[in-house]
């Protein structure tokens, strides 16, 4: 009995082996690395939707309340002549809105007025101003630039001095060699004209 009591119990106080406590680090596979390194390409945003037939007193909040049930909206605008544009974040939401507008029983309506929803890339509505994002801005900027473009003075074109000299002295260097009746003037007549001009200025002074 004494031998059993004197026997040390080493198993109770010895710590567990490192191999049991920690698992060796396993390097990731090459396939997993390739998947992580590949850039995540986001799908391009779908084209905007054109909403036609809006009432005159329709607001942006009313238009948003009708179309946000089909998906998340990134941009919404109301243009003139009862036309608006709605841009969804996904193509599925835009297709659902178009399908909802084509339902014969319900459709999409504001103030009991049914709306027509089509893609902005539809050739039937491409000529409408402000259909796509930025198209209206480019047109208005081009129109305003044409209307507000300053008129360049004639001096920059080199015409003011010529016009003034032609009005004051019709028989100047520009019309040299041509007489008043359409014939060719001789050097003697041109010298007489110059002498007359000089005498006239001397009399004025």
UniProtKB/Swiss-Prot annotation:
GO molecular function: DNA-binding transcription factor activity; RNA binding
Ranges of compositional bias, category Basic residues: 14-24
Family matches, as PROSITE patterns: RRM
Region (Disordered): 1-42, 170-191
InterPro entries: Nucleotide-bd_a/b_plait_sf, RBD_domain_sf, RRM_dom
Bias (Basic and acidic residues): 30-40
Keywords: RNA-binding, Transcription, Transcription regulation
All copies of domain RRM, residue ranges: 47-122
SUPFAM superfamilies: RNA-binding domain, RBD
Protein name: Uncharacterized protein At1g27050
Species the sequence originates in: Arabidopsis thaliana
Phylogenetic classification of the source organism: Eukaryota, Viridiplantae, Streptophyta, Embryophyta, Tracheophyta
